[in-house]
Swiss-Prot record:
Seems to be required for maximal rate of protein biosynthesis. Enhances ribosome dissociation into subunits and stabilizes the binding of the initiator Met-tRNA(I) to 40 S ribosomal subunits. The keyword Ribosomal protein does not apply. Keywords: Initiation factor, Protein biosynthesis. InterPro entries: NA-bd_OB-fold (IPR012340), RNA-binding_domain_S1_IF1 (IPR006196), TIF_eIF-1A (IPR001253), TIF_eIF-1A_CS (IPR018104). It comes from the Archaea. GO terms for molecular function: RNA binding; translation initiation factor activity. The keyword Translocase does not apply. The lineage of its organism: Archaea, Methanobacteriati, Methanobacteriota, Stenosarchaea group, Methanomicrobia. Pfam families: eIF-1a (PF01176). Residues 22-96 form the S1-like domain. It comes from Methanosarcina mazei (strain ATCC BAA-159 / DSM 3647 / Goe1 / Go1 / JCM 11833 / OCM 88). This is Translation initiation factor 1A 1.
Length: 111
């Protein structure tokens, strides 16, 4: 074995070039879920949401999501309006950038 043979990289399995199928969670109408865009952060786990039904709601980030997902202005989320106060909602899901692109291509996000 020569010194040149030692410097050659070993053949490793190349990553597959096939596109993987990822599932994107869509809002469920039976659970009263709606897509919304974060307009501004208000502090104390509250934010202003512009929902796809045209209503601007005050959103609340529940404790179960607080540490999992960092939400910023411009993010697309799924919100569930409160049954007794329609101008407030809970944020239950945050989309990543590739998921937002998929939602736009499929027509879930208007404009």
């Amino acid at each position: 074995m020569t010194l040149a043979d030692l410097k050659k990289p070993t053949s490793r399995a190349s990553p597959s070039t096939e596109e993987t199928v990822t599932r994107v969670r869509t809002p469920r109408r039976e659970n009263n879920e709606i897509l919304a865009t974060v307009e501004s952060l208000l502090g104390a786990n509250r934010l202003r949401l512009r929902c796809m039904d045209g209503v601007v709601r005050m959103g609340r980030i529940p404790g179960s999501m607080k540490k999992k997902a960092w939400i910023r202005e411009g993010d697309v989320v799924i919100a569930v309006p409160w049954e007794f106060q329609n101008e407030k909602a809970d944020v239950i899901w945050k989309y990543t950038r590739p998921q937002v692109d998929w939602l736009e291509r499929k027509g879930y996000l208007k404009g």
